């Protein structure tokens, strides 16, 4: 019988030394896919998952990777001082974690191998109004989280505990998650990036250490989402490096420039992903260039549905391509 070290030798090293077998296998799959094919992905944030229905109706297939949103699970939503738009978004997002769990279990039973990722628009742990994940709607100071004994730090850990409880349900079912906290920390529009990218980096490290060390969450693959070199948490904290790209207008692209900028600022030894895009990459260009994006994820609603951003022709081209991994 092979030893545990011998069994692990065939896998890419995970940031979490105690990562579950399923997480190790997922990371290895991503590594082996990158540059050979690209995994199709689509974000959703409501129970109906209208984006998936649209893709199925248009192409006859579904994305291999499905993104889910956790914003409604933020413990500190200020319902008394929220716009109708905010309240609608929260209401529509309720129940999506439970739906994600059900979907992932079904994927395993059916042998389809669908991949799950979470995005978390985290309402500020203290104070704030309306969509308080936006810096403009909260005076929450992320830098104070890094100081022992502050109310900000206590609230941060309180919220982390709440979200950990959700993630643990997936671990109990042996479901790995591409976990992308503190996304888009290269800018200041979210409170976790408002005090600079290095603060966001330190929050990411804090969460990694707490979730892997104290909460015993080992089903997560840790996705870093920034291309600022001085803010990179370090290889020991990261499984996947990623970037979000929203071009001002459509162009046929394999996002090669974004890839080079990302890996130059982070690591060429990690799996790389287009964690969010507005416009689909050109699958024909990708097949020629073999830029090693493991996956992409188109954003939700109008970025997927209709032809404001992605034409039916381009959507079909992606999902019909032998280079694209679909369900």
Give the residues covered by each predicted segment.
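Alpha-helical scaffolding within the catalytic cores
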Residues: 24-25, 47-55, 98, 162-166, ...
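N-terminal module-boundary/linker segments of secreted carbohydrate-active enzymes
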Residues: 1-90, 285, 323-325
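Hydrophobic faces of well-ordered beta-strands that scaffold small-molecule active sites
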Residues: 38-42, 64-68, 114-120, 177-181, ...
């Amino acid at each position: 019988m092979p030893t545990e070290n011998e069994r692990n030798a065939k896998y890419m090293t995970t940031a979490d030394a105690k990562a579950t077998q399923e997480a190790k296998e997922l990371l290895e799959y991503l590594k082996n896919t990158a540059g050979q094919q690209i995994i199709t992905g689509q974000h959703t944030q409501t129970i109906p998952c209208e984006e998936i229905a649209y893709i199925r109706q248009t192409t006859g297939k579904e994305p291999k990777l499905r993104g889910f949103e956790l914003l409604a699970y933020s413990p500190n939503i200020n319902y008394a001082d929220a716009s109708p738009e905010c309240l609608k978004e929260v209401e529509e997002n309720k129940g999506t974690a439970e739906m994600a769990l059900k979907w992932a279990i079904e994927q395993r039973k059916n042998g389809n191998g669908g991949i799950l990722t979470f995005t978390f628009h985290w309402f500020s742990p203290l104070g704030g109004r309306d969509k308080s994940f936006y810096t403009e709607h909260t005076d929450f100071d992320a830098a104070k989280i890094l100081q022992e004994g502050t109310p900000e730090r206590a609230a941060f850990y309180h919220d982390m505990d709440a979200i950990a409880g959700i993630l643990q349900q997936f671990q109990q079912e042996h479901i790995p998650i591409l976990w992308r906290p503190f996304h888009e920390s290269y800018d200041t529009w979210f409170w976790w990036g408002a005090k600079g990218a290095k603060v966001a980096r330190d929050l990411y490290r804090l969460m990694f250490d707490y979730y892997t060390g104290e909460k015993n969450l080992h089903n997560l693959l840790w996705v870093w989402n920034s291309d600022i070199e001085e803010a990179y948490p370090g290889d020991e904290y990261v499984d996947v490096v990623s970037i979000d790209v929203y071009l001002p207008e459509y162009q046929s692209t394999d996002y090669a420039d974004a890839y080079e900028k990302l890996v130059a600022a982070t690591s060429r030894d990690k799996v790389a992903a287009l964690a969010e895009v507005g416009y689909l990459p050109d699958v024909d260009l990708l097949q020629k260039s073999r830029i090693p994006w493991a996956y992409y994820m188109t954003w939700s609603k109008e970025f997927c549905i209709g032809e404001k951003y992605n034409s039916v022709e381009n959507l079909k081209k992606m999902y019909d391509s032998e280079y694209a991994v679909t369900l």
